[in-house]
């Protein structure tokens, strides 16, 4: 049974085809790795799978459901960038508040628990944290 199905997906940025008619099927229970040089499209396909980008053409299904603008599917996915994408002035607490508004299953109780376990000062600015 296919868990992820990518069919004929193309994504272009300023005339550069990052993905060109890509096809991929991932069966339930499988583990895949994406390997390739810079610019090969690894991050682009991940962002398409998470619904961050919308393909120019083709379709992406997870459990037979379209990903883009699908809240139920997006609740099950996360993309963690290696680049800072918060406002430079955001504190950890401010970022948590933003996420609490985006994710219906957000738990402040779990947030407080993790903050205490890892001894995190949530008043610290995100830009001051190490990766």
Regions found by a protein language model. Give the residues of each.
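Short coil-to-beta microelement around the adenine-binding A-loop and adjacent beta1/P-loop entry
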Residues: 16-17, 71
């Amino acid at each position: 049974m296919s868990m992820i199905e990518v069919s004929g997906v193309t994504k272009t940025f300023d005339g550069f085809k990052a993905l060109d008619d890509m096809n991929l099927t991932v069966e339930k229970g499988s583990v895949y790795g994406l390997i390739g040089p810079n610019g090969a499209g690894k991050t682009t396909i991940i962002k398409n799978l998470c619904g961050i980008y919308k393909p120019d053409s083709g379709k992406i299904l997870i459990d037979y459901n379209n990903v883009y603008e699908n809240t139920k599917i997006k609740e099950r996915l996360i993309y963690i960038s290696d680049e800072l994408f918060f406002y430079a002035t955001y504190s950890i607490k401010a970022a948590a508040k933003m996420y609490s508004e985006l994710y219906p299953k957000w738990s402040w109780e779990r947030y407080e628990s993790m903050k205490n376990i890892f001894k995190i000062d949530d008043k610290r600015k995100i830009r001051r944290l190490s990766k």
